């Protein structure tokens, strides 16, 4: 948008290879992938269209929709993993989690609901000026999402995980 508005823009690459978040790296022994590609689901269609990103080479071979776990994988140090090809629903992933903990398998659905509620709070602001904390608080005051926002703003990620799950 800066260049579109006539400003001079310089892009610098910190790494020894070009590609930034789209570069492929080994994130766990035997598992390679683009380390930040999972953020692409946040790329809004309006931005893609405004900047004509497809005309400049943007290609996305798939999107992840809620409940689609076929492209998600959770590797463990011993080489085993959960998710991945063949796991196409939250229920199938919960069944894999159940092998480790029935309580965590049930908690997985609460975890999904927490993040869906979080998304519903933030999504209206994706293409606007960021809201103030007061505006966010006002937007959920008196609703079931009030506690979700409080946790989003004041809890660490590890606190959220430990609140939901009994195992790593």
Q: Where would I find each of the regions flagged by the language model?
A:
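Residues within well-ordered alpha helices
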Residues: 1, 46-54, 96, 160
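Glycine-rich FAD pyrophosphate-binding loop
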Residues: 3-28
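Residues at alpha-helix termini
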Residues: 4, 28, 49-50, 99, ...
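N-terminal FAD cofactor-binding segment of flavoenzymes
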Residues: 25-70
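Structural motif
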Residues: 28, 76-77
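Short polybasic amphipathic segments
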Residues: 70-76
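Rossmann-like flavin
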Residues: 77-168
């Amino acid at each position: 948008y800066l260049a579109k508005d006539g400003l001079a823009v310089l892009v610098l690459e910190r790494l020894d290879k070009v590609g930034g978040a789209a570069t492929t790296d080994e994130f766990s022994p035997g598992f390679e992938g683009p380390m930040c590609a999972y953020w692409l689901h946040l790329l809004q269609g309006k931005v893609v269209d405004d900047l004509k990103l497809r005309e400049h080479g943007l290609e996305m071979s798939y999107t992840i929709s809620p409940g689609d776990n076929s492209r998600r994988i959770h590797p463990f140090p011993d080489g085993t993993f959960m998710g991945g090809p063949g796991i196409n629903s939250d229920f199938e992933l919960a069944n894999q989690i159940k092998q480790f903990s029935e309580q965590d398998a049930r908690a997985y659905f609460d975890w999904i609901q927490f993040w869906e509620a979080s998304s519903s709070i933030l999504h209206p602001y994706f293409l606007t000026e960021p809201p103030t904390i007061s505006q966010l608080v006002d937007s959920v005051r008196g609703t079931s999402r009030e506690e979700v926002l409080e946790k989003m703003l004041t809890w660490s990620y590890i606190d959220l995980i430990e609140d939901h799950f009994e195992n790593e």
